[in-house]
Amino acid sequence: VERQDRLRTVVLPAQSANAGQPLQSVMNDGIVVTALVREGVRRLNPEADTVMAGEDILVLFGSADDLDRAERALLQ
C-alpha cells in the first residue's frame, strides 16, 4: 500500500495546553511542520525549537493517520 502524504492546517486554540511547547513535540510520528503563521506573519519550515503560542496556525505534512493523531493532540 502506497503512503499518501498530504497537508493539513490546524489552528491552535487560544488556551491550548500545547502553547509554550516546542514544535518538535508535534514533529514526531511522521509529521513535518511546513509552516507556522502567527499574527499574520508566515514562517516557512520553522525550526523544531520554535515555541507554539495560542492561535498559531500550523501547516502539517504527513499521512492521514499521522495527521489525525497530531491534530487530536494539538486541539487538547
Mark where each language-model region is.
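Cytosolic Rossmann-like ligand/nucleotide-binding regulatory domains
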Residues: T9-Q76
